[in-house]
């Protein structure tokens, strides 16, 4: 969006908020889960213009016109959409388009995907196909460049092998936000040249580094892994995993899926230990 279009969009939101123009959609009488303040605020109305929220408050009746769609929340909770912090579309045996079609009705409004499975088969062109398809979705689909292709060298027959040069190229693509989960955690703390070169390319491009420390040892190897650059991690399963990652400056990802049920154990870092929830991520 250029500056002119942004200014026009903002003026349109202002007009709706002031009651000078009708909203496209109004949701009335919900319980607003305000993530900014940590409150649940009953009796809240929301007015929407286009793809943006123009008004959130106790009474949006001034924004309702003859063509405004009105939804009665009747006390239901109004929560922000889920930004799924880490997932693999290919694991669902679906394209990006069909995956989005499946999850949007359940409240997912953005996804952070690591297409290392398609990269294992098609290499860099496969990643580019995922990036291009992600760009035309109705929600934000952010793509990370796979860091470990193949994922198990010597134990599989992949269709491609990717390294620092491919990572450097991918970092120039619109839609690539960083380096995907660094699954080769021993390579990080043992100083593997290829692994550190990939991390270096991503950092040079100003991108984020995804983590994957799948070990219970929170001693020197864990500290060395964090020092190597990964910024988040979804592999924690215990309360102490969440605490250690948070204290070391990482963003702990609390994972809930068909194979992993790690939220209940790790969320105790917030509910029982009182740690700041703002750096925790759901995936």
Each predicted region: which residue ranges?
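Divalent metal-coordination and catalytic microenvironments
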Residues: 30, 46, 51, 75, ...
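Histidine/acidic residue-rich metal-binding segments in metalloenzymes
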Residues: 126, 161-181, 187-254, 260-282
